[in-house]
Each structure stands twice: as C-alpha cells, then as structure tokens.
C-alpha cells in the first residue's frame, strides 16, 4: 500500500507588522495562524502556537522593526521564539520570512574590535531551528552567505519600477553614493534611463551625519530619482537631493525598499527638495511617519509568490528573471 501525504502550509506572524502578514495570507488564500504572543510581568516574551503544525511547512513572518511596545530586538526575539516553538512542535520545515532583516548594516568589521552582528542574527535563526531564510533587498549581498542554509533574496525592484515609470520620460536614476551604483544601474537599465552618482563624504566620528559633495552625470534640467535600499535618518538622501538641485535638476524624487525613517527623517524630507518618496511596506508606517510626500506600494504580492514557490519547491529566482542574486 502506497502512503500519500498531503503537504501542509502554515503561516504565522509576529506583532511587528501584522497587516503585511494578513495581506500575504489573503493573497495565498490561507488563514494566518495564532502565535499567541504575550509578555510576562518582567518583559519576557512567550508564545503558544494555536494549532497543530506537525509535519507542516511553517512560514514565520516578521519585519525587524520598532513599533509601539516593541523594539527591533523584541521583534527579532519574537521570531526566534516562534521558530523554536514550531521546531519543538515537530514542523517539517521552518522558513523565517524577514521582509526587513535587522542589523543588516553591521555586515563587516569597519574598525577593530567591532562585531559582525548581521552574521550573529543569521546564526541565531539557524540555532533556533530555521531551515530557510527569505528576505527583501538585503543591505549587502554577502548576508546571503551568513545563514547556514538556503536564502531567497527577493527584490522590490518590480514594484518600485512600476511606480517610477509615472515620473516621466526624461528620467535620470541617481545613486546617492558609490556603494549603490550597481543597484541604481539595474533600475536605470530597466527604465531605459540615464545614470548619475552623488559622491558623499561622511563626517568623521559622527554617526548618521553625511555631507554630499559632487555629482557625476548629466542632471541639468532633468527629473532625477534617488534610489537606495533603505532610508533611515534621511541625511544621505536629503543632502544628495540638494546637490542635484544645485546642479540644475528640474525635480528630485527618492525611492527605497525599506522606509526606516528614524528620528529627524520625516521632517528632513518634508523640508527638502524631494518631491515624492516612493517606498514599499516592508516596514510598518505609523501615523507619525505618514506625510504627503510619501507613496507606499505593497510588497505582499512578491512575498506571497515567493512563499508559494518555496512551498511548491519551484524556482524563486524565475520570479525575477534570475536577477535577484545581487
């Protein structure tokens, strides 16, 4: 007698960005499982999965972000605890879905006696029991090698490019620094647009403080769009935008995958030459981070397709024409 087992897909989410997880579940036609997350009186996080996951493929969705009542460290810890709970409940395969991967900028030792925290986070996920990692637009490609297992590196480029097409014909895609030139070039090629680069000089010993310096490329009288993986305090983007205006750009917009928007970011963008900020919803955007210039596009369809491909054991890279390995 041949025994045929049916594959089971289960979706779970932490509390950092529940609306995104609910949108993904809706697109997949699946019900979002209950993780029953709570804190003890001393702040320790506890989870009890609400249904049987034995033998199932469990996808645990959590953006590593700060929201009311949760720090970025809490959001990572929630995901680790849910992974451990699923492993101990005999899940067949556990996939950590991290639309925004925390500590990604700490991907190397910039100076002596510094940690490589992006690698530490990857090790924690593996130790907790994750078999696979899914993320979007990692800050650097080498993070894919930090996790001891398959990593599906998705890109928000299809979503952002669709939005950027509405900016006009004579478009210049601009990299805000030399490190993002390769990404900006990919956008420029798909948009059939020209490419420009803004050189920047960081102020020594001042974290999150930058000074834009010069522009390479023809921007005079043209519409420019700055592209980066994330905008944190917006110092880089605003300084680059002012530099482009000084070099004759007719208008300047910005686009990013991850709108971190920490501290002074919102006020800086509001009071800058940036006309529109095009971004995705990899991170939650509470009321205090919403403003007229902000234009948010959902990343849920890309995540849903990737989750379906992983579950069905089909190609994820084909979703991006094989161009998601950078």
For the regions a protein language model found, what residue spans apply to each?
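PRPP-associated nucleotide enzymes
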Residues: 1-326
